[in-house]
Amino acid sequence: MAVQQNKKTRSCRGMRRSHDALTTATVSVDKVSGETHLRHHVTADGFYRGRKVIAK
């Protein structure tokens, strides 16, 4: 079983965890349909950057 050699300080622990924060997903609004979607993704009704790319 692994056992640490020396105790890690609160500072070292915090610096290690500084990259673990979660960010919210960036959401955009389509120009034509006004629907919200993830950036660089097609909307649910098939629009991408104001153009119909998927016919339903």
Swiss-Prot record:
Recorded GO MF terms: structural constituent of ribosome
SUPFAM superfamilies xrefs: Zn-binding ribosomal proteins
Keywords, sorted A to Z: Ribonucleoprotein, Ribosomal protein
GO annotation, cellular component aspect: large ribosomal subunit
Top-rank lineage group of the source organism: Bacteria
GO biological process: translation
Disulfide links within the chain: none
NCBIfam families registered for this protein in UniProt: rpmF_bact (TIGR01031)
Protein family per UniProt: Belongs to the bacterial ribosomal protein bL32 family.
PANTHER family, per the entry: 50S RIBOSOMAL PROTEIN L32, LARGE RIBOSOMAL SUBUNIT PROTEIN BL32
Protein name from the UniProt record: Large ribosomal subunit protein bL32
Taxonomy of the source species: Bacteria, Pseudomonadati, Pseudomonadota, Gammaproteobacteria, Enterobacterales
